[in-house]
């Protein structure tokens, strides 16, 4: 979720909490693999249930599972499907991230059995399912407010719950959600128990953790260790960009910084040197096993900052190719991109424009080709399993060539990106096949048997 700090409120509110509790030790020891074997070359697809179909239900979405599997989707990430709070609700339907009960399903979306059926069919089709988890805050009418008021942050006068705050204690503009107090005895264990409930009752394969950097890192270490000890190597994605979260057990983090670089290049505000600078910094900053979720859109970007076309013009596909070619890349597709999504989904109401699923769109072919390349070519695998990346930039033409894999290796992938008005000076790779040709980008790969 996006956070906009209300500076004016910061001076008016002083935060106090219970006496700090000692960090909860992992409830079990886990010495198994951190990353599931199936995550080696996986991609991720974000599911916005409310806006995906005219019905806006889990059952209606389920009919799309065979198509998504055929397209090559590996991981389905469901935005929160729990009930949405009524108190201080924004808009008619409210924010998905204002949850009133962690262990229930939003009746507007369907039932627990509906979701269980989706997970079962997704597994049969070879896909995995992860659920969005909102650990930083709840709705103001969450069941914990009455049952465990001590779980919430209080103001100087002892009032609770209060609006969610940032890491400096400043109130956000998320006026529909209440801040949780991670120093409260018993609160961490309750959160982990509710996460485990979903794994045990629905057989999901992991979590995408909302605004993970606003939650104590030692909690994540405890939670991930405990959940893996009882459920095996779950896949966990952080909506944040901090190496400490990889050390705490996350498999992947957001590539927010690179996303903003792509936006700026598309707008002509930066050139390709920004890509090289970003890549060089990452070589020293991130653990080798890091997976970065790169994207040209997601639910936040689409609703609040504009469509791919609004932000990137005709370079949207080129930017997706760029995201997929980067070292550590773990590329995202957002709901409807393969159907040519070109309008902003409203965040707190039902979309009235809709997605046209009646006929295949050319974007579906593009994404199918890109996902197939990642599956077939180890040069493009995730984390340290993928091959090393080399860059060659030409600022005069605002072009860059990216190669994954060393010369002489059996498997290589190469891409040339041209973001200027004239052609790049780079030579077309020899003994490789041209497999992707879109505005601003071309991709070649080794001829494999």
What residue spans do the PLM features occupy?
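Hydrophobic faces of well-ordered beta-strands that scaffold small-molecule active sites
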Residues: 43-45, 76-78, 129-131, 207, ...
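Substrate-binding/active-site clefts of carbohydrate-active enzymes
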Residues: 29-45, 50-59, 63-74, 80-202, ...
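Active-site-proximal helices and loops of the catalytic beta/alpha 8
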Residues: 25-28, 32, 120, 194-196, ...
